[in-house]
Amino acid sequence: TTEESDTIKLGGNFELSGGASAYGTLMDEGIKMAVAEQNAADGLLGKEIEYVSYDNKSEPSESTSVATRLATEDNVVAILGPATTGAANAQSPAVTRAKVPAILPAATGDGVTMDGDSVLEYVFRVCFQDSFQGKALAEFAQTDLQATKAVILVDNSTDYAIGLADAFKETFTGDIVAEENFTAGDTDFKAILTNIANLDYDVIFLPGYYEEGGLIIKQAREMGIVQPILGPDGFANSTLVELAGADNVDNVFYASHFTPNSEDPKVQDFLAAFEAEYGKPADSFAALAYDAAQLVFDAIANADSTDPQAITDALAATEDFEGVTGTFSFDENHNPIKSAFVIELQDGVEVGNSIVEPAK
């Protein structure tokens, strides 16, 4: 058992290659930094923390294998990751069987901590969920952008985008003038953009990831479509601006878990340390993963134990955890009660952010 061991082993199940590797790599780096900092401050319970991570190749089936290997062969006391909702759902049966807690930094799909109506005892997340960001973006569209007519361009190949579109439609009180579909991996969006080019609307809602998002922004702006474009947290990657071209990224807004422009000294220290360690800026995914690691350290300290069940119970009891992505407690479904940021981009650069509070 881990009780006799002189290190505390934490596992990482991340997308280090494949389609979601831009997210997974930053998360893995955020955790490595948190572990190094904690070890420099004398570790936990008098022991050094050892972090073991494997690549799930952005494949759900591989995510299951990695989780099983970490829990049963490496005997980790907790697993951090994976990044995506699909990979997280694939991991859940394995961590439930092994009775080892998993902390999801960024899996935003609504049901990810649930099995039907009952909560998964060993699954927690530090990010807000899709129904919340879909609602928050609809609120932002009608309140901050004063939009009364919207067009939705939805990636109909991912549960992520479909869930976001549904939550937006439920909340938006104006008219949905048109809804067009695309598929992950598409590169030419002229047809769907031509369909909406001459319609009368105030905002485009674009639930999808940064690859297609960046190309759609580029092609829309090049066709003279000037309306604000609103996206989810999947836009939060610098590749979005690279693909779109900075001069095309005007009036683009997206939901984020994190803003680097926070005054909080904790956030500024984190950003400086990450930049020094990796020679690149931290993004919201690095920040969420860093918080996920800190949350586990917190739970181990509060449990005063390296027993996975004791850590699980301490995680469930988390209250007012102060992370770099905000302060939160867990609700009964292991979702954090926290705010979202809506980031505004002009010329590809963040020029402002608004806070959208969770509904009480």
For every predicted segment, state its role.
Residues 16, 120-184, 203, 296:
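An alpha-beta-alpha
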Residues 2-4, 8-32, 54-61, 83-84, ...:
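Extracytoplasmic "Venus flytrap"
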Residues 63, 125-150, 162-164, 188-190, ...:
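Hydrophobic alpha-helical segments within soluble ligand-binding/sensing domains
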Residues 22-29, 44-114, 126, 181-189, ...:
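Beta-alpha junction/loop-to-helix N-cap segments that form part of ligand/metal-binding clefts
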Residues 1-9, 40, 357-360:
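Short, low-complexity disordered leader/linker segments with a strong preference
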Residues 276-286, 297-350:
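Segments of small-molecule ligand-sensing domains
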Residues 95, 164-255:
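Extracellular/periplasmic bilobed ligand-binding domains
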Residues 217-290, 344, 350-358:
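Extracellular/periplasmic periplasmic-binding protein-like sensory domains
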